[in-house]
Structures are given as C-alpha cells and as structure tokens.
Amino acid sequence: MKQSVSAEQIELKSSLPGSKKVYVDGPREGMKVPMREIEQSETNGVPNPPIRVYDTSGPYTDPAYKVELEKGIPTPRHSWIMGRGDVDAYEGREVKPEDDGVKVASKHTPVFPQMDRKPLRAKQGANVTQMHYARNGIITSEMEYVAIREGVEPEFVRKEIAEGRAILPANINHPEAEPMIIGRNFHVKVNANIGNSAVSSSIAEEVEKMTWATRWGADTIMDLSTGKNIHTTREWIIRNAPVPVGTVPIYQALEKVNGIAEDLTWEVYRDTLIEQAEQGVDYFTIHAGVLLRYIPITAKRTTGIVSRGGSIMAQWCLFHHKENFLYTHFEEICEIMKQYDVSFSLGDGLRPGSIADANDEAQFSELETLGELTKIAWKHDVQVMIEGPGHVPMHLIKENMEKELDICQGAPFYTLGPLTTDIAPGYDHITSAIGAAMIGWFGTAMLCYVTPKEHLGLPNKDDVRTGVITYKIAAHAADLAKGHKTAHQRDDALSKARFEFRWRDQFNLSLDPERAMEYHDETLPAEGAKTAHFCSMCGPKFCSMRISHDIREYAKENDLETTEAIEKGMKEKAEEFKEAGSHLYQ
C-alpha cells in the first residue's frame, strides 16, 4: 500500500494576524485575483482604511478552502488554456523508477494519486508561450490577471513581455499557478529554493516548505532536489503550488546516470526536460553558457566553479573534450520549451563564489554567451531571464546590472544576492540582502533568497521563513528606491500607526506580524501594553513620539503652530525656573 502526504502531516497556517483574503474581480467571468487586506483600527474615532497588499499564499489562507494535498489545489488557468484552442492532451512519457533515482519503485513512496492526468502540449505547428501571444498583439487572461496584481494596464504587461523585458512563467501543465510577472518595471520578486538532498528531508517536509515559503511571500519556488524521489517530490509540490516552480534539470539527469557526470548524454537530458515540462515546471535553469574554452580561465580563481550545474557541465566538457551539449543543442531545447511554455532561466554556471573572483573574465565571458543565447530563444518566442551572481562587493554590483542589460538586451536579471562579504557564515542572509537591495534598486527583477544555512546545510522551514522575510525586505526597499507608485503606501500606514501608538496595527502591517508581536511581548506582555504610549526601549518618560504628541497637543490648545509652541513652551519653562529661584538643583 503506497502512502500519501496529507495536510495532517504538515503545518499549514491560516492568514497572517489582522489580515483576510479578498478577491478582486477580473475582466473575464470567474477571474478572481487574490489580495491580502490588512485591517486598521480607528484614530480618535476617525477610521483608517484597510491596506491591500500583494498575496502569494494561494488558497491556503482562505478560510473557505479545505486543504486536500492529495487532490492538489484549484486550477484557475485550465479554462483559459483550453479556451485558446492551441493545445492537445496526450499520453505523455511513461514514468519510470529511474525518474526517482531508483532501479525499482519503492512501495513506501507516496505517489501522487492523480497520476492519470494527461499532459498538454502545443498542437502541431503552434507556439503557446506568453511571449508569442504578446508579440502577436494578444492580451491573454494571464496578462490581465497580472495587470490587476501589479496595478498597471494589461497593454503595458503585454508590451513588456513582447519586448523581452519581462517574463510571465506559466507552463500550460501548471494550471494551479496564479499568474505573476518578473520584470524590472514591476514589483521586485523573491524566489525561495527548497528541495531534498541525498542525506536530508522527505516529500512531506518539502511540500510544507513550499506552503511555508509562499505564506511569507515567496513569488516563485525552485525545487532543487538531488536525492531520491525527485520526480514524485516535484509532482506533489507542483500540484499544490500557487506560484511558478523552477528546477535545474541537470540535477535529475545526473541522478539517472548514477551521479557520473561524464555519462550524461543529450538524450538523457532531453528526456528529463520533457518529463519535467509534462509535470508543469514553469522555468528551467539551463547552464548552456559554460563553454569548453571558458573552463581554463577559472583555474586562477580563489574558489573555482561554485555552481553545481556549472561544475557538472565543466566536468563533462573536460572528460569528453567536447563543447557543452546544452549549448550545441540549444535550438532543440527551444523547440521543447515553446511546446509547453517553459521559460529559460539561463544559468550563471561561472558565477563568482567569493569576493576575490567577482566580475572576473570567466563570469563576464559566460554572460556574453548568455546574451547570444537570449537572441536565439527570442527567435523562437521563448521567454528568458538571466541568472546572476553570486559574491560581489558593493562597489562592483552596479557593473553587473549594467552589463546584463546591455549584453542580454534588457532581459530580466535574476540574482542570488549577491553576497557582499565572505566572512559571515550563519549570517549570509544578511550579507546577501545588502547586495540584493542594491541590485534590485539598479534593476534586477527577481532575487533568489539566501537563508542563514547558506554554505552550511539544508535549510529547514524556519530558515525558509527567515530567508523569505529577509529578501522581502530587500525587494521592498528596492521598490521604494525605484519609486514604484504603490510601494510607500504600506510604509506610510505603518509609520502613522507607530506615531499613534496603534501597536496591533504596527504588528499587522509588518512583513512578519508574528515576530513583531513576539518581540514586543517579551518585555510588555500585558494586554494594556498594546495601547500604551511607549515601549520598553525608552519607557514612558523618554518616548520621543509621546513627547511629539505632547507638543502637538500643546500647540492645538494654545492655537499655535508647532514651532511656535516649542518656543512658547521654552519661554514658560524659563520663567518657571526664574520664579523658583534660578537654582540648578532644588
């Protein structure tokens, strides 16, 4: 009897405190775009309006939704995909034990119950990518959905996709995903990496990490599983993921050849691409820019090649003394991608793994090749984003953004940090968030989170939470710096709540309400402290905001401007001092 993964096995939390799930009706029948609405209390009887924010949590935070992981979540895109009339259902490839990294399927593996689902692909001669539709002047339902989420016009979304400045990752076999967009003229997005390894984690844990990450604000998920049950883990994640899912197909291909890089072949890799496309993976990291001639350049580096995918392909190239088969077969890969609308995330296999290697010849040589490959993908109307570093000191970050925009013709940049120093293992979520905020400001479209476990171990769900929140801070700071028209609204609301001592509103408006409340209550746990005009930092006598309130009240009572009130108050205090005898100590 094969086991299943149930909601009881994982921790699923409802909406964040003070929030509720709301839906905005779209222009098409049945289109409902989710938002999170944060309630606010009154100020002296005057209402404060609720604040609506972008929501990535899917149906899990809707109290009306019954979670049944074995059935998957609703499929809002299915009718849109079928309604375009350019796809066919077909039998698909046979799922084999090797897909899960074993010779014989285990009876203990919790196979997803709906495995009889037939995959979709483009009809003969058709192209089903969002870029293809956009270039033909078609505004899809997905584009309309995204426009509501981003607060822009659908035509703007279409144009950004058509010109390659943004991607809308939306595999036709992942109808569960709520459409989102990645581009520098939209909100900066955050990706969270999850996935098992050969020594750690289970399917249930990875599904839990996915729901956990999206609850805290992850815009996409990458399943980087490298151990057993890769196919099955991915199926459970995709069928229950409300956000796009990315993978690095070379990891699974390597498992199929028993971890021996030189045994990899184009045929094994191609089969893996089709397998994952049929499951519904929305974007593939493909290290097609690691060319044979670039590998010797890395020999003088401090940390060599640190990308797993990059090192696998480098090993294959050196063993066979042949060019990277991902590069030589790139046009064939494009043909597969456009049948399912899988987006490219062109991998930076030669990214710097240390500050000493930042912005070196190997890194930028690969970037030149990624620019070449971008043009080829666009020729097929396949969506592309470019992966970036890595480890880069602050003064070298801007050059990365400028070169990417120039060499890759404005394709969205997707960066891992970058980490701005190498000396803080255990705190690399901080070292990288510094770089992430900067490069997001300069134009990076999506930031790949880093957790405190980076360089040390596989992150657990608490590390995932810390990583996501840290990167939501960086992304939001970048949105503010870029002047995104709605970015400041939440900041303004929280600042107003802080000045008015509306403690619960402060908690609820924050990126992590539970943590904010927890820290406040460590020193002032009483319910009355939630309305007190001070916190434990300054106490009641030294609270600057309480003093500011007193000044304003004094000005109001005496019909004065605030500056006049301060001057008048100082004169009155001086008179009191004189009348008391002008003694310094009473």
From Swiss-Prot:
Binds 1 [4Fe-4S] cluster per subunit. The cluster is coordinated with 3 cysteines and an exchangeable S-adenosyl-L-methionine. Disulfide bonds: none annotated. The keyword Endoplasmic reticulum does not apply. Substrate binds at residues 193, 222, 251, 287, 307-309, 348-351, 387, 414. Residues 22-33 have a biased composition (Basic and acidic residues). Keywords: 4Fe-4S, Iron, Iron-sulfur, Lyase, Metal-binding, S-adenosyl-L-methionine, Thiamine biosynthesis, Zinc. This is Phosphomethylpyrimidine synthase. The gene is thiC.
